[in-house]
């Protein structure tokens, strides 16, 4: 069984810029952790993001040139601080659109409710191989602002899609969806920063990190921006940036 392929990126190559997959770990760190620090070093960021020092240096060079971070000192004694978090976030939003960057498949399901679907994932040992995304992640964090009853899932391994289709009794759907499967662009962020969300006493699933959920929703056509703004006005991690970005 094959799902309905929604849209794909126009290029198979990873963009070689600060918004690429691995580089995004640094942006995530800056906007969530670095924003709380008076100063930090490139070596510190590279270590915490598990990236090579060379990649971190290239990303910081670009961030400095664009004025997002401020640098003090020389050579190995350089220290940085995040100078323009709101501008960095806005530029990231301008350069990332989940619909353009990710492959998506839309389905209807024979199951009657979300709990049955989540329990089926757990029963088939798939709960650590999918990640709640978009509106599903917003709901899991307790910040749902729509009446949508859809499920959006990142799939960490593309070869698992057919198994998920089979176990969840999925049928392709051309317009709208009950379930949306997504092959992620920002795999590095998901692997490093996804959080465990307790949906009920028996259901515990991984959720897309709050910042990535916001980025994903902002340009998502199905009531995404509305949901993103609702979250940004209420979640402290986002409020620090968003209040200056609107």
Give the positions of each predicted feature.
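Long, low-complexity, charge-rich intrinsically disordered regions
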Residues: 1-2, 97-246
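Short, Lys/Arg-rich nucleic-acid/phosphate-binding segment
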Residues: 72-95
């Amino acid at each position: 069984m094959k799902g309905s392929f929604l849209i794909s990126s126009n290029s198979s190559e990873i963009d070689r810029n600060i918004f690429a997959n691995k580089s995004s770990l640094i942006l995530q760190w800056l906007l969530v952790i670095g924003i709380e620090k008076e100063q930090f070093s490139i070596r510190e960021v590279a270590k915490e993001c598990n990236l090579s020092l060379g990649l971190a240096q290239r990303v910081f060079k670009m961030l400095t040139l664009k004025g997002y971070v401020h640098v003090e000192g020389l050579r190995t004694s350089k220290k940085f601080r995040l100078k323009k978090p709101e501008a960095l976030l806005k530029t990231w939003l301008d350069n990332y659109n989940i619909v353009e960057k990710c492959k998506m498949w839309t389905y209807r399901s024979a199951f009657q409710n979300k709990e049955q679907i989540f329990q089926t994932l757990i029963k088939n040992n798939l709960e650590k191989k999918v990640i709640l995304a978009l509106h599903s992640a917003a709901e899991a964090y307790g910040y749902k602002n729509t009446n949508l009853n859809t499920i959006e899932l990142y799939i960490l391994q593309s070869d698992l899609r057919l198994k998920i289709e089979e176990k969840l009794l999925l049928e392709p759907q051309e317009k709208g969806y009950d379930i949306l499967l997504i092959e992620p662009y920002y795999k590095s962020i998901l692997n490093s920063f996804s959080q465990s969300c307790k949906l009920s006493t028996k259901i515990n699933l991984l959720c897309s990190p709050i910042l990535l959920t916001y980025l994903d929703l902002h340009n998502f056509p199905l009531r995404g921006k509305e949901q993103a703004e609702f979250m940004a006005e209420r979640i402290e991690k986002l409020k620090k940036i968003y209040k200056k970005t609107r």
